[in-house]
C-alpha cells in the first residue's frame, strides 16, 4: 500500500516520538509503505496485535488517571492541555490518519466492486419488511 498518506502518517508518528525522545521502529514504516508481495494475513494479525497492545496500554492509563474513555477524549481534544509543538504534532497525525482512512475506504470500495463485477453478482439491497403493525391510538380511553 505504497502511497503518500501512509508516508505522512509515518512522518507524523516520527514527529510525535521525537518530542518525547522515543526511537522509531523502522520496520513499522516498511510494513505501511512496502508494496512487495505482502502476506496480508500476517499484516492483519500484526495490526490486531498492535491494536490489542495499545488498548491494554490505554486501559492502564485510564486506571492510573481515574478517567473514563470519554473524559480522556475530551482531554485529548483540548489544545490547552498540550504544548504548541505537541498539539501541532497531534493535529498532523490526525489529518494524516483521516486522509489514509479515506484512501483505504476508497480502495476497499474499488476492490469490492471489482470482485462483484468478476463474480457476476451485483450487490442487492435487502427488501424492506413491511409488516403491517397497528399503531396505538392517541388519546384512547380503554373501556
From Swiss-Prot:
Record field: compositional bias (Low complexity): 119-130
Source species, domain of life: Bacteria
Composition-biased stretches (Basic residues): 131-143
Region spans: Disordered: 111-143
Family: Belongs to the chlamydial CPn_0742/CT_635/TC_0003 family.
Name of the protein: Uncharacterized protein TC_0003
Amino acid at each position: 500500500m505504497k502511497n503518500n498518506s501512509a508516508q505522512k502518517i509515518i512522518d507524523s508518528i516520527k514527529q510525535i516520538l521525537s518530542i518525547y525522545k522515543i526511537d522509531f521502529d523502522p520496520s513499522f514504516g516498511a510494513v505501511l509503505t512496502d508494496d512487495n508481495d505482502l502476506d496480508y494475513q500476517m499484516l492483519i494479525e500484526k495490526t490486531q496485535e498492535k491494536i490489542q497492545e495499545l488498548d491494554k496500554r490505554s486501559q492502564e492509563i485510564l486506571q492510573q488517571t481515574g478517567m473514563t474513555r470519554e473524559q480522556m477524549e475530551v482531554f485529548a481534544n483540548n489544545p490547552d492541555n498540550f504544548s504548541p509543538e505537541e498539539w501541532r504534532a497531534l493535529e498532523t497525525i490526525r489529518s494524516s490518519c483521516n486522509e489514509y482512512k479515506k484512501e483505504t475506504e476508497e480502495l476497499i470500495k474499488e476492490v469490492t466492486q471489482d470482485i462483484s463485477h468478476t463474480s457476476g453478482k451485483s450487490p442487492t439491497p435487502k427488501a424492506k419488511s413491511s409488516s403491517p403493525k397497528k399503531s396505538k391510538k392517541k388519546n384512547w380511553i380503554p373501556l
